[in-house]
Swiss-Prot record:
Residues 38-48 have a biased composition (Acidic residues). This is Prokaryotic ubiquitin-like protein Pup. Protein modifier that is covalently attached to lysine residues of substrate proteins, thereby targeting them for proteasomal degradation. The tagging system is termed pupylation. It comes from the Bacteria. The N-terminal unstructured half of Pup provides a signal required to initiate unfolding and degradation by the proteasome but is not needed for pupylation, while the C-terminal helical half of Pup interacts with ARC to target proteins to the proteasome. Residues 1-48 are annotated as: Disordered. Is modified by deamidation of its C-terminal glutamine to glutamate by the deamidase Dop, a prerequisite to the subsequent pupylation process.
Length: 67
């Protein structure tokens, strides 16, 4: 056995997969700002609803004596 050479398996890291698609290009700035404005409007609406619900909750809590 001393005269036999052992073959080592090749590492998979040395092989490059060419089937991996490239990332899509970044969206234009106009689309990004339009999307951001829509999200901002939605967050403002949610904030308003939460504020009105919080006021009602506090009133109901105080009327019940905090129980």
């Amino acid at each position: 056995m001393a005269g036999q050479e052992q073959q080592q398996p090749q590492s998979r890291d040395s092989q490059v997969d060419e089937d991996i698609p490239e990332a899509p290009p970044a969206p234009p700035e106009a689309q990004a700002s339009a999307s951001t404005e829509g999200v901002d409007d939605l967050l403002d609406e949610i904030d308003g609803v939460l504020e009105s619900n919080a006021e009602e909750f506090v009133r109901a809590f105080v009327q019940k004596g905090g129980q």
